[in-house]
Amino acid sequence: MLTLKILVYTTVIFFVSLFIFGFLSSDPSRNPNRKDLE
């Protein structure tokens, strides 16, 4: 059960960090006129 929980937590953290990284890296290129948010 502990191994399953660790696997789930690792997958969740991986996808969350991937989503945050993708959002931060694509946000300025998608909205070049909103650099004041940075």
Curated annotation (Swiss-Prot):
The chain crosses the membrane at residues 6-26. Disulfide bonds: none annotated. One of its GO terms (biological process) is photosynthesis. One of its GO terms (cellular component) is photosystem II reaction center. The keyword Transmembrane helix applies. It is found in: Plastid, Chloroplast thylakoid membrane. It is a single-pass membrane protein. Keywords: Chloroplast, Membrane, Photosynthesis, Photosystem II, Plastid, Reaction center, Thylakoid, Transmembrane, Transmembrane helix. Its main location: plastid. The keyword rRNA-binding does not apply. HAMAP family: PSII_PsbI (MF_01316). Belongs to the PsbI family. One of the components of the core complex of photosystem II (PSII), required for its stability and/or assembly. PSII is a light-driven water:plastoquinone oxidoreductase that uses light energy to abstract electrons from H(2)O, generating O(2) and a proton gradient subsequently used for ATP formation. It consists of a core antenna complex that captures photons, and an electron transfer chain that converts photonic excitation into a charge separation. PSII is composed of 1 copy each of membrane proteins PsbA, PsbB, PsbC, PsbD, PsbE, PsbF, PsbH, PsbI, PsbJ, PsbK, PsbL, PsbM, PsbT, PsbX, PsbY, PsbZ, Psb30/Ycf12, at least 3 peripheral proteins of the oxygen-evolving complex and a large number of cofactors. It forms dimeric complexes. This is Photosystem II reaction center protein I. The lineage of its organism: Eukaryota, Sar, Stramenopiles, Ochrophyta, Bacillariophyta. The gene is psbI.
